Structure formats: C-alpha cells, structure tokens
A protein has these predicted regions:
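Conserved N-terminal Rossmann-fold NAD(P)-binding element of oxidoreductases
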Residues: 3-8
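Hydrophobic/small residue at the entry helix of a nucleotide-binding pocket
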Residues: 11-12
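NAD(P)-binding Rossmann-fold cofactor-contacting core
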Residues: 26-39
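Rossmann-fold cofactor-recognition segment
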Residues: 41-54
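N-terminal Rossmann-like NAD(P) cofactor-binding module of classical short-chain dehydrogenase/reductase
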Residues: 63-68, 89-90
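ADP-ribose/adenylate-binding Rossmann-like module
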Residues: 80-98
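Rossmann-fold NAD(P)-binding glycine/threonine-rich loop
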Residues: 92-112
Length: 380
C-alpha cells in the first residue's frame, strides 16, 4: 500500500517528511519536481511530476492519495480513488461535491478523510474532547444553556503595524473577507454579510492572558451536529471563527472599505492586484517566526451561573522545525493517513475523527508540535 502524496507546498512538508522518515512507502507528486526535490530530495528519489493520468496508471487498490494541492483538485482525485479502490485524505473543508461521494465510498469500504489539518482539523479534535468530557461530567444536564466558541488564527510572532503577515498568496484571505457567515448568538441565528460587521474582543486564557479580535467564519451551524451536540440541547452561543491580533481592524479599515465597493470581474481583478501588493509588502521573510493561536471553549450554565467551563488552548510558533502553520496542518494529515492504513477510520466521507483513542493519540502529538497546549478549567 503506497501513500501517493500530491503537493509539496509550504504547509505540506513536515507531515510528508514524517511519513518518509517513519519508513512508509511514499511516492511524491508535485507540479514542480525541483521544488519537491528541495523539500524532500534528501529523503527520497521517488518524486514525480504531478499528472492525474500518470497517477491513475500507478494507483493500486488500498493506496492512499493525499491532496495537498489547490482545493479544486480534491474532488477529482477522490473520484479517481473510488474508481481505483484507493483511499483519500485532505486537510480541506468537505465541499458538497465531496459529500456526494459518501454513499459510493461506504459501499466500497473506502475512506475519504477531510478536515484533518489545523482549522479545520485540530479544532475539531479539541471540540470532540470537550463535548465528551462535558457529557461524562457530573454537571451534565440537557437543560443547561451551552456556549461554544472556537477561534483560530495565524498571526506574526512579532506583531507588525499591519497586524498580519502572509505565508502564501493573500488572495484566499481577501476572498474570505467577502464571505458571509452564520452562527448562533444569544439563542438566535446570526447572519453576517461581512466579517467586520461582527468583530468582537476575545480574552484568550494563555499563560500570559492576551486579548485578540475575533469574528465568525463561514457557516458554523452544521458543526453543531458534527460535534455531537444532542438535538435537544439548549444552545445559547455557537461560533467557529477567525482570530486576529488586537488592532487588526484598525490597521485594515481602508481595506475593508475598498472591499465593500468591489463587484464583478473588475472587483475580482482589483482583489488580485491587492493580493499581489500585499504579498510584496507583508509576506513572511525567510526564517521569520509565525504564530498560531487556537482556543476552543465550551461553557454550560444553569440560571445564568456557569456549572462547567473549559477551554482547550494552543499557542505555537515557528522554530528550528520550521513554521508553526506547516507543522500543525500537515502532521495531523500524516496521522490520519496512518489511521486509514491501520483501518481505524470508518468508510465514507468523514472529517477529523471523534474516536476517543484517536483523539488521545492525535492531541498527544499536537502537544509535541505546539509550545503550549492546555485544557483550562475556569471553575477550579
């Protein structure tokens, strides 16, 4: 069984190297073989120019295809896997087109695993851990009012006036600023057209407490079921969101104002111009330390008083091992690949696992990747 790893971009390398160093049978595919050789040429000579047809020729039943390529490749590669009786893993959100492959994958006994990077990925693991711990606690009561928040962000380790730096093309970040979000605030559905319309402050329970700016991201509501909340639980707040350094909204206010005016093809062209400019002005320098902060919080209240309240908090930054972002995206992917090979993940289209044994193993590994990882109990 061969791991067919496609894509050797910035966020892919630590997980790929981990698998090769562990002795797994790994073939590497990348559009630029030179870049792949720079990344892993010291460990392997099994490097191929990425081509879907060439991959199809060598793909065998039981192999695992890993897509660390741009998102539009995930579904075509997953479909190829189904046709060849192979498994598939990516770190990306499950698109409707991917979800549509679930029944076929189940019928064939094949795993199509997604959402197992950082966010989505590690955040899911933390959420599953907290929900399971709450269920097992003496404070559990279906009548409690529950508040769930999950905030993640990549930020510069050393803050800059722009309050942000880019690890790769800024276009994705800029496009996300044009995306609506859906969450629950104070028992009501909150629909927001632009992130800056729902900015709030968040006090992260780090060893040295720190305040960040946060805003809802995408559609949080489907994750209520994904995180195994019972349908009859009373949900006061449920937000999955993005975290930024304090002062970010002030530093970006002119960008927000311009994005508000952009429309159609001309707007897309201007967004690309802005992306190119920001890449010139605000990209990480070679060797510069990045930082990732992730806080997943679950609180249960009775009559307005907290009866259970814990936060899973992580703080990680770039070091001699490379960037925090690359470690935290790609190593969970590598763990999921091993779980697929070990038949520990059910067939079908699935996000990050919720099995307690896998949670313990994966989060244990995250503890080695991050400089700080802790479950904070606010009531002790």
């Amino acid at each position: 069984m061969t791991i067919q790893w496609c894509g050797t971009g910035l966020s892919a390398i630590p997980g790929l190297r981990r698998l090769i160093e562990a002795g797994h049978d790994v073939a590497v595919w990348n559009r630029s073989t030179d870049k792949a050789e720079t990344a892993v040429g010291d460990l392997t000579d099994r490097i191929n120019a990425f081509d879907k047809d060439a991959l199809a020729e060598v793909l065998k039943p039981g192999d695992v295809v890993v897509s660390m390529l741009p998102g539009d490749w995930h579904v075509p590669l997953a479909e190829l896997c189904l046709s060849k009786d192979a498994h598939f893993v990516s770190s990306s959100y499950i698109a409707p087109e991917m979800r549509a492959l679930d029944a076929t994958a189940r019928d064939k006994g094949l795993c199509l695993v997604n959402e197992i990077g950082l966010d989505p990925g590690i955040d899911h693991l933390m959420a599953h851990h907290l929900v399971a711990e709450y269920r097992a606690s003496g404070a559990f009561d279906p009548a409690n009012d529950l508040s769930f928040t999950s905030y993640c962000g990549g930020v510069p380790k050393v803050p800059n006036p722009f309050r942000y730096k880019f690890s790769w093309s800024p276009l994705g970040v800029l496009k996300a600023l044009r995306s609506p979000s859906r969450s629950i605030r104070d028992f009501s559905e909150l629909n927001v057209a632009r992130p800056w319309d729902a900015l709030s402050s968040y006090d992260a329970p780090l060893p040295t407490p720190e305040t960040f700016e946060v805003y809802p991201n995408r559609d949080s509501i489907p994750f209520i079921a994904d995180y195994r909340f019972d349908p009859d639980w009373r949900i006061k707040d449920f937000v999955r969101g993005t975290l930024r350094l304090n002062g970010w909204s002030e530093a970006w206010k002119d960008i927000f104002a311009e994005i508000e005016t952009l429309e159609g093809a001309a707007g897309d062209a201007r967004l690309k111009e802005m992306s190119d400019q920001f890449w010139q002005e605000h990209a990480y320098d070679e060797g510069e330390a990045d930082r990732v902060v992730l806080c997943v919080d679950l609180k249960a209240e009775q009559a307005g008083q907290p009866v259970w309240h814990k936060t899973y908090v992580m703080d990680a930054w770039g070091d001699a091992r490379g960037t925090a972002m690359a470690r935290l995206v790609s190593i969970p992917v590598s763990l999921a690949i091993e779980s697929v090979l070990n038949r520990e993940i059910p067939a079908g289209v699935t996000p990050a696992p919720h099995d307690p044994k896998l949670l313990a193993r994966y989060l244990g590994e995250v503890g080695h990747l991050a400089q700080h990882l802790q479950v904070v109990d606010h009531l002790t």
